[in-house]
Regions:
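Glycine-rich phosphate/pyrophosphate-binding loop regions near the starts of catalytic domains
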Residues: 15-171
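Short, compositionally biased
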Residues: 178-183
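Single conserved hydrophobic/aromatic residue that forms the stacking wall/gate
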Residues: 1-7, 11
Length: 183
């Protein structure tokens, strides 16, 4: 199977979304690629993105490595910011659980703090929801905000023939693709 049939077709979903826009500060900056939304702010832009860890949560539970999902959640978001040239500034989290679990939340919190430290951004808030009718186990997501000067936005339009590409070996699948990896 491919990713769109195993999980969700992100690109199809994005094509279905129509934005509400304003003019001046707060006006959306259109990007054809990337996972961060940008809005004008003076000569700069606020970059924002929301992401979760997905089905890697199941693997983290099996390996008793829950603290890693906090790090992964921050990384998934801040990586989306830096891909457009934005410096990560702030992160907020959302954790939904089927029942209160102080030990689980402490481990997730330690991971979130470490992820923010590694990303050089502030952990500035969050929400914990106890939703036994909707959630079985737990889920985590977060939102990152960053800043970039508008003339420094990376959008792919300045790529040209003859540019040097640098490829780095990945240390692993990070937090993407676990739905397929587990199959």
């Amino acid at each position: 199977p491919d990713y769109s049939s195993a999980a969700s077709d992100v690109y199809k979903r994005q094509a279905q979304i129509k934005g509400v826009n304003r003019k001046g500060d707060g006006e959306a900056i259109k990007l054809d690629n990337g996972f961060a939304g940008l809005v004008k702010l003076g000569d700069g832009a606020l970059a924002m993105c929301t992401d979760g860890v997905g089905s890697k949560l199941l693997l983290a539970e099996q390996m008793n490595s829950i603290h890693t999902v906090g790090i992964d959640c921050v990384a998934m978001n801040t990586n989306d910011l830096i891909c457009v040239g934005a410096e990560p500034l702030s992160f907020v989290d959302y954790v939904a659980l089927d029942k209160p679990d102080e030990d689980l939340m402490a481990k997730i919190g330690m991971g979130l703090a470490e992820g923010c430290k590694q990303s050089n951004c502030t952990l500035s808030g969050g929400e914990t929801a106890i939703l036994p009718e909707l959630v079985h186990g737990f889920d985590i997501a977060g939102t990152s905000v960053g800043y970039v000067k508008q003339d420094k936005i990376i959008d792919g339009t300045k790529i040209s023939e003859g540019d040097v590409l640098i490829g780095l070996k990945s240390s692993g699948p990070h937090s993407n693709g676990y739905t397929l990896i587990r199959k």
